[in-house]
């Protein structure tokens, strides 16, 4: 097991400064280019790196300032994954909002580009020597849990086990190796699904999709271990179990008992960040 940089650590997500929120809105309206937005993101990341170092943190993130969604930004760049265009829904109070886009696996999953490399290189350039830049990516289980079997092409994957899980793990392995080649030694996978499987409402939703919520944690442990088996030597691979967060409101509750065996006995990860 690889050791954490210090006895204290953090998940890595920070509130975006107002000027970055405004720039993202301008980009969405077509008022600025992606290149102009990236320069604003660079400024915000430089500032949040300094903040983390000033308070004494040893693992340093980019605040996740380049993300729109914690999972889609990454997974949508894998070959074989398609994200539907978000639709506007009307809420009970009459207001409208964009529903989160839906991801589907439409072909064989594969690594077609280095997804986080440029982001990591900028982060690394800002981190003081002696501190450790940390990269956060979504858990591979995000490609299965939300849509279940119906969200994965039967033409590409008549059976999920083992081909689907192997293909996703291989794609993740390629990404981890590209990061390691650039000097990354610390990667965190963000996973909502194991925490969701502690909540009876979410467990019932899994049943409705045709999955067994008692079996899923063990299947996901084996799935995640396929990724862990491909991590480069010297890389720390952690998992953040997130209960969901929207305007400081969690999406799932419940103790960890339904997933504890799979989480703590079966998975081969180096560290966990667990929300209570």
Regions found by a protein language model. Give the residues of each.
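Domain-level signal for soluble alpha/beta catalytic cores
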Residues: 1-276
């Amino acid at each position: 097991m690889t050791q954490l940089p210090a006895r204290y650590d953090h998940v890595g997500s920070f509130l975006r400064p107002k000027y970055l929120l405004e720039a993202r809105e301008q980009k969405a309206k077509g008022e600025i280019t992606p290149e102009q937005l990236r320069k604003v993101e660079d400024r915000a990341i430089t500032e949040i790196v300094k903040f983390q170092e000033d308070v004494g943190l040893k693992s340093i993130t980019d605040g996740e300032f380049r993300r729109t969604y914690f999972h889609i930004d990454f997974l949508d760049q894998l070959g074989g994954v398609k994200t539907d265009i978000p639709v506007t829904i009307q809420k009970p109070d009459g207001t409208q909002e964009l529903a989160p886009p839906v991801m589907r696996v439409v072909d064989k999953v594969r690594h077609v580009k280095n997804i986080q490399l440029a982001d990591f290189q900028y982060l690394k350039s800002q981190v003081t020597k002696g501190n450790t830049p940390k990269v956060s990516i979504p858990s591979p289980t995000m490609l299965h849990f939300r849509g279940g079997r119906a969200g994965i092409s039967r033409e590409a994957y008549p059976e999920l086990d083992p081909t689907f899980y192997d293909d996703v793990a291989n794609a993740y392995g390629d990404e981890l190796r590209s990061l390691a080649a650039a000097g990354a030694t610390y990667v965190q996978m963000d996973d909502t699904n194991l925490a969701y499987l502690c909540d009876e409402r979410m467990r019932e939703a899994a049943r409705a999709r045709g999955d067994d919520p008692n079996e899923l944690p063990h299947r996901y442990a084996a799935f995640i271990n396929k990724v862990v088996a491909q991590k480069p030597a010297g890389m720390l691979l952690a998992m953040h179990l997130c209960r969901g967060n929207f305007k400081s409101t969690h999406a799932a509750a419940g103790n960890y008992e339904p997933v504890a065996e799979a989480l703590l006995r079966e998975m081969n990860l180096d560290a966990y960040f667990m929300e209570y």
